[in-house]
Curated annotation (Swiss-Prot):
Protein name: Putative pre-16S rRNA nuclease
Organism of provenance: Mycolicibacterium smegmatis (strain ATCC 700084 / mc(2)155) (Mycobacterium smegmatis)
InterPro entries in alphabetical order: RNaseH-like_sf, YqgF, YqgF/RNaseH-like_dom, YqgF/RNaseH-like_dom_sf
Function: Could be a nuclease involved in processing of the 5'-end of pre-16S rRNA.
GO-annotated cellular components: cytosol
SMART domains: YqgFc
Length: 170
């Protein structure tokens, strides 16, 4: 399936159950990483992984895999940049490539794609409102975007699981 055909996954589908999740915001220079608590309620920033597009050894993917192992993640959520018209953005190809490389390294832990429209814009706004100057944003913007991606997934997952329970209880 081509990148243009890749749609975001649905939270709660094929859910692995309780456990930490890792959220990833793929950028060309930096990759933001966030983690959830074991109950999947709250996303928090973890780190920013440096990335060199000329590096063909995949050092950034190895670091991401090490974080998945360190946090004992049951699921990884990678932001999939889509345009407002719901098409794959230029960055989507890169995000899918990183997600696929990571999936090969951490199998059988599932790697999901989540719609990340406007997460970086939202992260910049949040940092600006918190009084963080533009210069200081560079260091944390990717982590804040990863938190946004993961928190959105966690919230949608919780709603999907609750709806599923209501459907079986009724």
């Amino acid at each position: 399936m081509g990148t243009d055909d890749r749609l975001p996954d649905r939270p709660g589908a094929d859910d692995p159950g309780r456990g930490r999740r890792i959220g990833i915001d793929v950028g060309t220079v930096r990759i933001g990483v966030a983690s959830s608590d074991p109950d999947g309620i709250l996303a928090t920033p973890v780190e920013t992984v440096a990335r060199d597009k000329r590096d063909k050894t995949g050092k950034h993917v190895r670091r991401l895999a090490a974080l998945v192992k360190e946090y004992e993640a049951v699921e990884v959520i990678v932001g999939l940049p889509r345009t407002l018209g719901d098409r794959a953005s230029a960055s989507a190809h890169d995000a899918v490539d990183v997600a696929e490389q990571l999936a090969r390294r951490i199998a059988p832990t599932p790697v999901r794609l989540a719609d990340e429209r406007l997460t970086t814009v939202s992260a910049q706004r949040s940092l600006r409102e918190a009084g963080v100057r533009a210069r200081g944003q560079k260091a944390v913007i990717d982590q804040v975007a990863a938190v946004g991606i993961l928190q959105g997934w966690l919230d949608q997952r919780r709603a999907a699981l609750a709806a599923r329970r209501e459907g079986t209880d009724g």
